[in-house]
Amino acid sequence: LSQNISSLISKNLFERILVHRNDRACGAKGFYTYEAFITATKTFAAFGTTGDTNTRNKEIAAFLAQTSHETTGGWATAPDGPYSWGYCYNREQGSPGDYCASSQQWPCAPGKKYFGRGPIQISYNYNYGAAGSAIGVNLLNNPDLVANDAVVSFKTALWFWMTAQQPKPSAHDVITGRWSPSVADSAPGRVPGFGVITNIINGGMECNSGSNALMDNRIGFYRRYCQILGVDPGNNLDCANQRPFG
């Protein structure tokens, strides 16, 4: 295994993919750096290093696409198109609530809010707690680190990407071809491909309801990034006919 994916995604490619993230209209201007991304990937050595070069590039494209959707500042007539505006934000927009759920293992810290932050917009105390434990940072007490420290921010997104949360597989295992659907997955239409990753992330809102703008936006980012990285996006890109997990 290579411990570094910079041989596949150079700083120049990273800038082409996330071309407008430092636009003055973006709330996270200057936050998401290439160096922070590469540093964070070293904590998750299998990311972007599993399988052949085509598979590795597809994983990078899929990760950056899903997280670009979560952080997009794009709109239909945006300069260079809506899929050039990923990584525009590092915290949930509007007036988000506390996102505090009852948990013995990961109790909420007084006065802290666990709304969406970072590339995957990690939410809820139980995700902040588990992610922090995995990367060695106390995020229950310091959730704002995910919007203030770019390396920590990328690490939370990579933790979510690499970690299976039953009954869901990890996005990593799906995109690298290591997930084989069970009978319980196949019957509801959950098949390997980019679409089931959308199901993992937000299936309850976006899947099994035909075509919708949110799901299609994720696919749009993925197609653009695959084109830049020179890989075929593969089959089963949507989850229109997939029932959510669980």
Swiss-Prot record:
<keyword id="KW-0326">Glycosidase</keyword>
<dbReference type="GO" id="GO:0005576">
    <property type="term" value="C:extracellular region"/>
</dbReference>
<comment type="similarity">
    <text>Belongs to the glycosyl hydrolase 19 family. Chitinase class I subfamily.</text>
</comment>
<feature type="disulfide bond">
    <location>
        <begin position="100"/>
        <end position="108"/>
    </location>
</feature>
<keyword id="KW-0378">Hydrolase</keyword>
<dbReference type="GO" id="GO:0016998">
    <property type="term" value="P:cell wall macromolecule catabolic process"/>
</dbReference>
<keyword id="KW-1015">Disulfide bond</keyword>
<feature type="disulfide bond">
    <location>
        <begin position="26"/>
        <end position="88"/>
    </location>
</feature>
<keyword id="KW-0611">Plant defense</keyword>
<comment type="function">
    <text>Defense against chitin-containing fungal pathogens.</text>
</comment>
<dbReference type="GO" id="GO:0004568">
    <property type="term" value="F:chitinase activity"/>
</dbReference>
<dbReference type="GO" id="GO:0006032">
    <property type="term" value="P:chitin catabolic process"/>
</dbReference>
<dbReference type="InterPro" id="IPR000726">
    <property type="entry name" value="Glyco_hydro_19_cat"/>
</dbReference>
<keyword id="KW-0964">Secreted</keyword>
<keyword id="KW-0119">Carbohydrate metabolism</keyword>
<feature type="disulfide bond">
    <location>
        <begin position="207"/>
        <end position="239"/>
    </location>
</feature>
<dbReference type="GO" id="GO:0006952">
    <property type="term" value="P:defense response"/>
</dbReference>
<dbReference type="InterPro" id="IPR023346">
    <property type="entry name" value="Lysozyme-like_dom_sf"/>
</dbReference>
<keyword id="KW-0624">Polysaccharide degradation</keyword>
<protein>
    <recommendedName>
        <fullName>Basic endochitinase</fullName>
        <ecNumber>3.2.1.14</ecNumber>
    </recommendedName>
</protein>
<dbReference type="GO" id="GO:0000272">
    <property type="term" value="P:polysaccharide catabolic process"/>
</dbReference>
<feature type="active site" description="Proton donor">
    <location>
        <position position="70"/>
    </location>
</feature>
<dbReference type="GO" id="GO:0008843">
    <property type="term" value="F:endochitinase activity"/>
</dbReference>
<dbReference type="InterPro" id="IPR016283">
    <property type="entry name" value="Glyco_hydro_19"/>
</dbReference>
<keyword id="KW-0146">Chitin degradation</keyword>
<dbReference type="Pfam" id="PF00182">
    <property type="entry name" value="Glyco_hydro_19"/>
</dbReference>
